[in-house]
Curated annotation (Swiss-Prot):
This is Light-independent protochlorophyllide reductase subunit N. Belongs to the BchN/ChlN family. [4Fe-4S] cluster binds at residues 25, 50, 107. GO terms for molecular function: 4 iron, 4 sulfur cluster binding; ATP binding; metal ion binding; oxidoreductase activity, acting on iron-sulfur proteins as donors; oxidoreductase activity, acting on the CH-CH group of donors, iron-sulfur protein as acceptor. It comes from Chlorobium chlorochromatii (strain CaD3). Its cofactor is [4Fe-4S] cluster.
């Protein structure tokens, strides 16, 4: 159950180190954002590396005509002042008829100092806006590219009049989860203004000075701050709605913003009971979370309240005000921003956690050394929000533990034999 909600942020053992994140670049957000905004097209100005990444990561064949594409930078483009994309954009309009085109930056053109904002403005028309989205891996974690997309959409959200008090949920979720969240709000008597983003460009929610913004993803601090400053909206600072504990606090805090007092402790208890079999398997398990998705804080909080022992929770970026409630709920837990991965490796080898939640890039080496691993990317792609997502969330953690329990004893040599012949010679 809930513990530590009233403590100071300083009580969390918050440490900042100096490492880069072993994670995808922001282009990965295309995988879920193009499916969410159904009348959009995502155009990336990038290199062959970007093309290979998206082709492999998203598993799309070219004949499927997905609503994203890459304008390749070749050697000859390095001598040009600015890339020419007018023909590409005209082809996109003819083939896909999008209502909006998002122009995403990548590492190489950013190093070349391409004026993406000016390029997008030049390509934009009243009928089909072209919006610049900074998405390279030079600055942002891959989930923060969604933050950039939502920030680009702000000018296209209508102005809600003063006195119209409704909640707008910030964050991309599938249509089924959005319907569940809307139903949960309406059941509590909370008027809903919509979601940012909605599934169509012309359906973006009206936002004004009396709008309450409820972030449902922990990596959307910039768009929340932008709307607060530009529209005067109120940002809900609560736990994020992951797990029974987070869902209860989120909905109680949101209802309070509308002058509604609700007690959801019974519903929280029923949700914990619903996943008792899963939490029984998590109790006492040592879990280590490496930095990847920026979901790590709420995931660690859920695991802790489910009975797991959190050895370390690390995240690429931690924004103290935006993540305040999650940090309070993790007081006493070692929380690390921009962790040094080499130090983490030594800690993991020494402490031998029962479960490591980590990125796709580091998962296989951990498995090869005998550890049980959960891909952190999976939490991005599954419906794990609010009450309807409780079972899915718990199952994601339990599945690798159950799988390992059904396998024969791990033979490390099967993975490592011949991997480093030079090491064998000197052994």
């Amino acid at each position: 159950m809930m513990q530590g909600i009233g403590g100071d942020i300083q009580d969390s053992q918050l440490i900042r180190e100096d490492n880069v994140t072993h994670s995808f670049c922001g282009l990965a957000c295309v995988g879920w954002m193009y499916q969410k905004i159904k009348d959009s097209f995502f155009l990336i100005l990038g290199t062959h590396t970007c093309a290979h990444f998206l082709q492999n990561a998203l598993g799309m064949m070219i004949f499927a005509k997905p609503r994203f594409g890459i304008a390749l930078i070749e050697e000859g483009d390095l001598a040009k002042n600015e890339p020419t994309l007018q023909e590409v954009v005209s082809e996109i309009k003819a083939d896909h008829h999008p209502s909006v085109i998002f122009l995403l930056s990548s590492c190489t053109p950013e190093v070349m100092k391409v004026d993406f904002k000016g390029l997008a403005d030049h390509l934009s028309t009243p009928e089909t806006p072209v919006l610049f989205v900074p998405a390279s891996g030079l600055v942002y974690n891959f989930t923060q590219a969604e933050d950039s997309i939502l920030s680009a959409l702000v000018p296209y959200c209508p102005q809600a009049p003063a006195g119209e008090k409704k909640v707008v949920f910030l964050g991309s979720v599938n249509d089924s989860t959005a319907a569940d969240i809307r139903a949960d709000a309406e059941e509590l008597g909370i008027p809903v203004g919509g979601f940012l983003p909605e599934s169509r460009f012309d359906k973006m929610p009206a936002i004004g000075p009396d709008t309450v913004l409820a972030p449902i993803q922990p990596y959307l601090s910039r768009v929340a701050l932008k709307l607060s400053r530009e529209r005067g909206s109120t940002v809900l600072h609560s736990l994020f709605p992951y797990g029974p504990d987070g869902s209860r606090v989120f909905w109680e805090d949101l209802a309070r913003e509308f002058g509604i007092t609700v007690d959801l402790r019974e519903r929280e208890a029923a949700a914990w009971e619903k996943i008792r079999k899963q939490t029984d398997k998590l109790k006492g398990k040592k879990v280590f979370l490496t930095a990847d998705t920026m979901l790590e804080l709420p995931l660690a909080r859920f695991l802790r309240h489910a009975g797991a022992d959190i050895m370390e929770c690390s995240s690429a970026y931690i924004i103290k005000k935006f993540h305040a409630k999650e940090l309070e709920a993790l007081q006493g837990v070692r929380v690390v921003e921009q962790p040094n991965f080499h130090r983490q490796l030594e800690d993991i080898r020494r402490e031998r956690p029962d479960l490591i939640v980590t990125s796709l890039m580091t998962a296989n080496p951990f498995v090869g050394n005998g550890f049980v691993v959960k891909w952190s990317m999976e939490f991005m792609l599954m419906p794990i929000h609010s009450w309807s997502g409780v079972v899915s969330l718990a199952n994601l953690f339990v599945a690798p533990l159950q799988r390992r329990s059904m396998l024969p004893a791990f033979d490390e040599s099967v993975w490592l034999e011949g991997a480093m012949p030079s090491a064998e010679v000197h052994a």
